[in-house]
Curated annotation (Swiss-Prot):
GO terms for cellular component: periplasmic space. This protein is a component of the leucine, isoleucine, valine, (threonine) transport system, which is one of the two periplasmic binding protein-dependent transport systems of the high-affinity transport of the branched-chain amino acids. The keyword Signal applies. SUPFAM superfamilies: Periplasmic binding protein-like I. Its main location: periplasm. GO terms for biological process: amino acid transport. InterPro entries: Leu-bd, Leu_Ile_Val-bd, Peripla_BP_I. Keywords: Amino-acid transport, Disulfide bond, Periplasm, Signal, Transport. The lineage of its organism: Bacteria, Pseudomonadati, Pseudomonadota, Gammaproteobacteria, Enterobacterales. Disulfide bonds join 76-101. It is found in: Periplasm. The gene is livJ. It comes from Citrobacter freundii. Pfam families: Peripla_BP_6. This is Leu/Ile/Val-binding protein. NCBIfam families: PRK15404.1.
């Protein structure tokens, strides 16, 4: 090699080493339930985050910088969520994907907003979350105020029950959804016989089942999560009830079928569309399956989209406030399709679908 070639090679090596020296890791806090009764939804979130970060980094990351996931467990518990949020602050992380449950997301968001940390939640649906004038809170899912009307419309137009009961778990997510469904059913002059709450964590629902039978209830909407829904379904069917049940995406988990068995067949659920069935997402589905993980969960995809949204913002600025401004003013291409946000941080035009849940843990479009 002549001197000119050696000089050129040396220059290329120096440039490469220089780029490596300046490349840095961008830490992203991914917060969800790794323990507790709804840890299955945390599994979905972390599956989506892990795959999104791997795919983003494989394509060069953010201007050569790699995203690094730092996992935190809030167990969907408000007090633990606050402790986690404070740890995120102390760890010096500026970007959060999470939390999952509305009841834990809201108190954590207070801390993030005060500390200038961007939070994109892939699952919290409570309208109150983005109704407080915060600048750094966004989401990649819809609202209870979207999901409730979708459920009520289907109940009134398709199911047409005569006597309806609405039951919830007394938590922000479940009760908020239940009230949204109730309000919309009343607008349609549907007969809501009773609206009542159970306690999350209960396993004996014989009193509720007896009341459903006594009141001749032919349709139940349940606002809450899968552990209680699974028990209610199993016990209702064991008592001979033919009542139709419906719930939100919080019950749409394969663990529901593990609890309820064949009693889960025919449950109606509202949830985001089946993004794992979108042809363009097949390479991601295959990559997740290759790791023996499940790509079907709704929060796999809303989390993946949250990371894509964060990446789009980071390509413009590393300032959380500037990222939030950018996302609210632009559209981002994601696995969910193009996403855009309003001034509050809510998605524009997000739609929930209605699905038939099956005993094998899958969901198909409801007729």
């Amino acid at each position: 090699m002549n001197m000119k070639g050696k000089a050129l090679l040396a220059g290329c090596i120096a440039l490469s080493l220089s780029n490596m020296a300046f490349a840095k890791d961008i830490k992203v806090a991914v917060v969800g339930a790794m323990s507790g009764p709804v840890a299955q939804y945390g599994d979905q979130e972390f599956t989506g985050a892990e795959q999104a970060i791997a795919d983003i980094n494989a394509k060069g990351g953010v201007k050569g910088d790699k995203l690094v996931m730092v996992k935190y467990d809030d167990a969907c518990d408000p007090k633990q969520a606050v402790a986690v949020a404070n740890k995120v602050v102390n760890d010096g992380i500026k970007y959060v994907i999470g939390h999952l449950c509305s009841s834990s997301t809201q108190p954590a968001s207070d801390i993030y907003e005060d500390e200038g940390i961007l939070m994109i939640t892939p699952a919290a649906t409570a309208p109150e979350l983005t109704a407080r004038g915060y600048n750094l809170v966004l989401r990649t899912t819809g609202l209870d105020s979207d999901q409730g009307p979708t459920a009520a419309k289907y109940i009134v137009e398709k199911v047409k029950p005569k006597r309806i009961a609405i039951v919830h778990d007394k938590q922000q997510y479940g009760e908020g959804l239940a009230r949204s469904v109730q309000d919309n059913l009343k607008k349609a002059n549907a007969d809501v016989v009773f609206f009542d709450g159970i306690t999350a964590g209960e396993k004996d629902f014989s009193t509720l089942v007896a009341r459903l039978k006594k009141e001749n209830i032919d349709f139940v909407y349940y606002g809450g999560y899968h552990p209680e829904m699974g028990q209610i379904l199993r016990q209702a069917r064991a008592a001979g009830l033919k009542t139709q049940f419906m719930g939100p995406e919080g019950v749409a988990n394969v663990s529901l079928s593990n609890i309820a068995g064949e009693s889960a067949e025919g449950l109606l659920v509202t949830k985001p569309k089946n993004y794992d069935q979108v042809p363009a997402n097949k390479p991601i589905v295959d990559a997740i399956k290759a790791k023996k993980q499940d790509p079907s969960g709704a929060f796999v995809w809303t989390t993946y989209a949250a990371l894509q949204s964060l990446q789009a913002g980071l390509n413009q600025s590393d300032d959380p406030a500037e990222i939030a401004k950018y996302l609210k003013a632009n559209s981002v291409e994601t696995v969910m399709g193009p996403l855009s946000w309003d001034a509050k941080g809510d998605l524009k035009g997000f739609e929930f679908g209605v699905f038939d849940w099956h005993a094998n843990g899958t969901a198909t479009d409801a007729k």
